[in-house]
């Protein structure tokens, strides 16, 4: 979804030499991961809670009376596609992402200069303040200001938390713990949907729904005070002794010299590039494939239409005549499918590769969008706003198929792949670019979807299906497989690609030539050593 956040990807060739018991996995790592992962709950809870409260009559009556009046009209006198079309209602949803995009322009610099832990602390305070304002909102302005503060908090958290998890995780389990952030987002969504279902009949239940967003913020706030800073951040900022002590604490052993040396070497390399230099490198011809692919994946992730579904699915079902409690229950079912499918991604991403999941997910999402459009186009023309329960159940099943496809493909991979193709030179700017573009298009979709549905009717689902076709072809023809690719070989991987090699021009050809020379030297060494595998030949 807007779901997720940047994932730091670091490849260490000596990781197999660290020799930690159980690969470095221990109870302390679990506590660190669970506490820091509450940053994902912040994001997920906000995504999940928004659509539910906008379908609650008390909320609409207080802040959006014109929409409330439309919902009370007889079913045969209202247009099911336009009942909730209102720019102010869409601003309530989308202002969150506009604020997150603004923060992302400088969040990378704050994370690098101040550290991951202080950034998480600031993010949790901002989110807590936003939750408080929303819970106590007396008018639309107060509501939107609260949403902006929530966006500031998530914008900072999405830049810091995944990086924190990655740098604390043992190398052997780094990929799995990185994906845990996306899992936390999906859990946050379903928790919010369950809260909405429970508060729908309460007096001012929407206040409780919005206010409970403060719970994960409090967890992250306490965790930010108690958890250690990451070894990488401490070492980058010149605190090597403290960095080694934290590393030993995380690994539950003093035998951390090899990993400590690797972190020091990586930190030394990364500090060679300021954030300004990182942005300059990203926009150079040599790294233009990373810029284009990162930006397109971030944009296309939102053009799947997932956030339109997650934000507005209760509104969608309510518009088609489903009872409010049933509409909210449908969101819980969709949220459960979202969580289950994310587990599929965690366990299959390193088995089937990134391209395989992208392609399968694209085909499945396309089918889901087209079938949804066809069913609504036929059935709404026949029944208006009183869809039969069997038809509503069929739409729910198709949406679940679509959401599952997203959750094991474009959801987590939309963040993972951009992180894997960033070199040391471009990492800071590249991941900021991913967040900025993602939040920008989340804002656009959030602000436009209800108006698009009113204007395009069932065709809005074909609009997103068309984009799914484009992104699937993009993956097939333009995206190299990044599974297991060391970060230092990423530019060469793009230089060998049929399209990106042309984009990189002379720089790309030079990289390929250097790689061929290196390989030729390795082969020559193996031949001279008397063995094809590079080991000394045995005496006969």
UniProtKB/Swiss-Prot annotation:
Q: How does it sit in the membrane?
A: Multi-pass membrane protein
Q: Which GO terms describe its molecular function?
A: monosaccharide transmembrane transporter activity; symporter activity
Intracellular or extracellular location(s): Membrane
- State which ranges are Cytoplasmic (membrane side): 1-29, 112-124, 169-176, 229-296, 338-355, 418-435, 480-540
The SS bond pairs are: none
Q: Which domain of life is it from?
A: Eukaryota
Question: One GO CC term of this entry?
Answer: membrane
Any ranges marked Extracellular in the topology annotation, and which?
51-90, 136-147, 198-207, 318-326, 377-396, 457-458
Which keywords, in A-to-Z order, does the entry hold?
Answer: Membrane, Sugar transport, Symport, Transmembrane, Transmembrane helix, Transport
Recorded coiled-coil stretches: none
Name the residues that span the membrane.
Answer: 30-50, 91-111, 125-135, 148-168, 177-197, 208-228, 297-317, 327-337, 356-376, 397-417, 436-456, 459-479
Give the function comment from the record: Active uptake of galactose.
User: What does the similarity note say?
Assistant: Belongs to the major facilitator superfamily. Sugar transporter (TC 2.A.1.1) family.
**Protein name as annotated:** H(+)/hexose cotransporter 2
